[in-house]
């Protein structure tokens, strides 16, 4: 370089890869809020011009089949963990003398407890679940021995045996027995996987709080500074802004959707078939997943990011992708408008019915008549025409979670550049788009609504977004 400043050379030139099933939303400015009369009189959506950055957004709501992939990964990870713990109890010495000589629980031992010959030397496609989704060592309690153990990672090269008749040995049966509901809880005597065990851990950094408080002296309730035993002032450190599920009273989010919402949301109504079949039956595989809380949706986003980054890691690619996340309220409205200015609906027209009398979305058009539009409940995620950005069902079908906390005055106090009001103490989260059980007012792109973050509904789903990195004009 002849002593000249040339900068660090990257191994590969970066290019933004469009995630499968997403559309590129180019970003730009638009008039956010109600352009028509606010017939409800909420006065919480005044018009203003804002700008959002480009991003990728799922073309459809996340479907049952897509969400099942997340559920199955968590299920497999927990199962491998239980099998590994039982293998350690059976053979506490940490090695398997009969490796390769038979099919028994010993082959599911933690990779760190196997000899180099036994352990899978390749990087697993996915790391493990909960505290097991890191390759670093950590301490935990073996549920079978109630003793502290040191764990690094699971061996994902071994295929789990689900056929009860093919379980290889008694320890394997004992481990699997803990994963299924008891006989007393089994309807018709059929024991199924205990969905209460399906929990996922993910760690986030509260960047906004860190930017404002990092290094600031902590104070008590009276405003007096706090000191340690040596008389030094206690300041906020990085660990204070790490949101770690499973610690500090924060539970691991449950993963399995709440299927009882189909019964609980509607009193004196027969919806048992939806409760029994909607998430389970293959007929509904391409329908939007519902019964998912805001926390569960965020957990899915974290897992989806992890899945892609683990794939790149397996390819020995040092690059990581921007994280998947829920859209902000402004991003959602900008995407729903499809580039159309002052539009009332995503398709641009002033009505939810076409000039030929065809309904343009799945909603409740007439009092008491849910099916006049052709669907009583939800429809497949790729139903009706997409808007000009290629997004389906941005109005109707299911309402969608956003990352934004609900505040009546957020439009007045928020920034005009990538506006978003986040408040982790505010459990009311914005939902947008209206659903199959809503009237046309909630389908309008400027209508705001909210639901509590820990509440699951039969009419709320979600879709994810990913930031676009670089100049979109290149």
What are these regions (language model features)?
Residues 60, 64-68, 295-299, 330, ...:
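A structural signal for well-ordered alpha-helical segments within the folded catalytic domains
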């Amino acid at each position: 370089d002849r002593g000249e400043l040339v900068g660090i050379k990257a191994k590969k030139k970066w290019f933004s890869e469009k995630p499968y099933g997403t559309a590129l939303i180019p970003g730009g400015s638009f008039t956010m809020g109600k352009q028509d009369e606010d017939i409800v009189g909420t006065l919480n959506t005044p018009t203003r011009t804002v700008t959002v950055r480009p991003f990728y957004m799922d073309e459809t709501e996340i479907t049952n089949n897509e969400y099942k992939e997340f559920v199955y990964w968590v299920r497999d990870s927990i199962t491998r963990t239980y099998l590994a713990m039982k293998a350690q109890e059976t053979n506490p010495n940490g090695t398997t003398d009969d490796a390769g000589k038979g099919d028994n629980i010993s082959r599911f031992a933690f990779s760190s407890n196997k000899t180099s010959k036994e352990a899978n030397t390749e990087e697993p496609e996915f790391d493990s679940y909960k505290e097991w989704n890191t390759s670093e060592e950590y301490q935990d309690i073996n549920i079978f021995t109630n003793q502290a153990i040191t764990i690094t990672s699971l061996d994902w090269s071994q295929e789990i045996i689900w056929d009860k008749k093919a379980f290889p040995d008694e320890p394997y049966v004992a481990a699997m027995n803990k994963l299924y509901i008891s006989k007393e809880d089994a309807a018709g005597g059929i024991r199924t996987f205990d969905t209460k065990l399906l929990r996922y851990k993910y760690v986030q950094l509260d960047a906004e709080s860190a930017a404002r408080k990092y290094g600031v002296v902590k104070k008590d309730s009276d405003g007096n500074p706090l000191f340690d035993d040596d008389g030094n002032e206690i300041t906020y450190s990085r660990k204070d802004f790490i949101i770690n599920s499973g610690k500090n009273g924060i539970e691991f989010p449950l993963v399995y959707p709440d299927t009882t919402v189909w019964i609980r949301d509607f009193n004196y109504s027969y919806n048992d078939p939806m409760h029994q079949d909607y998430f389970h039956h293959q007929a509904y595989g391409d329908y939007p997943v519902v019964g998912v809380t805001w926390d569960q949706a965020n957990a899915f986003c974290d897992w989806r990011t992890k899945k892609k980054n683990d794939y790149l890691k397996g390819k020995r690619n040092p690059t990581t992708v921007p994280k998947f996340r829920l859209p902000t309220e402004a991003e959602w409205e900008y995407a729903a408008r499809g580039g159309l200015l002052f539009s009332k609906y995503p398709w641009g027209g002033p009505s939810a019915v076409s000039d030929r009398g065809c309904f343009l979305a799945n909603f409740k058009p007439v009092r008491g008549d849910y099916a006049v539009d052709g669907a009583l409940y939800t429809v497949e995620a790729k139903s009706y025409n997409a808007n000009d950005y290629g997004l389906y069902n941005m109005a109707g079908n299911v309402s969608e979670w956003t990352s934004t906390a609900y505040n009546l005055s957020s439009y007045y106090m928020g920034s005009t550049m990538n506006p978003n009001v986040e408040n982790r103490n505010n459990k009311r989260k914005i939902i947008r788009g209206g659903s199959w059980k809503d009237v046309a007012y909630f389908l309008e792109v400027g209508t705001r609504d909210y639901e509590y973050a820990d509440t699951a509904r039969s009419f709320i789903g979600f879709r994810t977004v990913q930031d676009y990195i670089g100049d979109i004009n290149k």
